Amino acid sequence: MAKSDAPTLFQVNGPVGLANWKDYCYDLSGTKIAGDLTSDTYALKDGDQMLGIGYVIESYGLITNKTLLEKAGYTVDDIKSFDDLKKVAEDITARKDELGFSAFSSAGMDGSSDWRYKTHLANLPIYFEYQADGIDNTDAIKGTYLDNYKNIFDLYINNSTCDPTELAGKTGDDSRNEFLNNEAVFFQNGSWEYNNLVGDGKPFTDDDLTMLPIYIGVGDEANQGLCTGTENYWCVNKEASEDDINATLDFMYWCVSSDEGTKAMANDMGFVIPFKNAVESPNVFVKADKEMTAAGKTPVAWNFSTMPSENWKN
């Protein structure tokens, strides 16, 4: 960035990356691309300044087999909070032999699966702690909602396809295959799983599946959305010339607003972009996130990039 021919457009991965580069970042507040975001949740801010804009997003939550849920006597409308989820999961467990399926697929702690819990699930108590404290990063995570984290994980492992003593050896493939085989109603994972579940040779159609928020009993659960975020933020070098800055802003806006740009982002690059003119995705989980956001529900931001280290997670 200190070179004479430094780039005008660059990328950071989130608050931690921004901390290293924010002195170079142009304030994007009031720009056309900022106005085209579907939610300010996808902007990276430092105080009142918008220093980064997420340009590709993914969502994760509880992938839900609606068909099995209905066989158990419930619909997705019955699950609007942690208490609701707990009631449904424990009732399914109580009738597991009769129903022929479990509430949750295995929460395996093998390395192919544990990231779902020590990173993605752990994001929720951190997010709500940051919300309560009015911050988006910290030098010391307090653990305000660790009990809630324990409660949701206990719900997973005590209402699962397997005994908790078996989880150490369970893999990500095990969990997915249990879900594919109609052995569980809920499967914590993300929008990237869509092609593993729906399509040629797969057992599900779009009508069978949806994604629910991961409720942990904190915050405004009635208005909670999916965990939707990114580790890919566009930033503009404020040290560049005015002409280069303006040309870069025009290019960014073209990418997310024009027919040619949005089709290139969606079809050529496979991106889901958080902008008003985005090409419609066929992914049922992406559609669920879009519907929740349009209904005014707040996406849970990805704060796991602020976790101190892998050792801290372990």
Residues covered by each model-derived region:
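Conserved N-terminal structural module of periplasmic/extracytoplasmic solute-binding proteins
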Residues: M1-G17, G30-I33, A168, V218-E221, ...
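A structural signal for short loop-to-beta-strand junctions that line the ligand-binding cleft
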Residues: P7-T8, A34-L69, G100-S102, D220-C227, ...
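Hinge/lid segment of periplasmic solute-binding proteins
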Residues: V12-G61, R116, H120-A122, D208-L212
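Short, solvent-exposed loop/beta-turn-alpha elements that line the ligand-binding surface or hinge
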Residues: D27-D40, F104, G108-G111, I126-N151, ...
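Extracytoplasmic/periplasmic solute-binding protein
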Residues: L51-Y55, Y60, K86-T138, A184
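Extracytoplasmic/periplasmic substrate-recognition and gating elements
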Residues: A72, T161, G201-N267
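Glycine-centered hinge/linker elements that transmit conformational signals in sensory
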Residues: A89-E90, I135-G169
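C-terminal capping/gating helix-and-loop segments adjacent to ligand/active sites or protein-protein/ligand interfaces
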Residues: T228, G270-N277, K287-N314
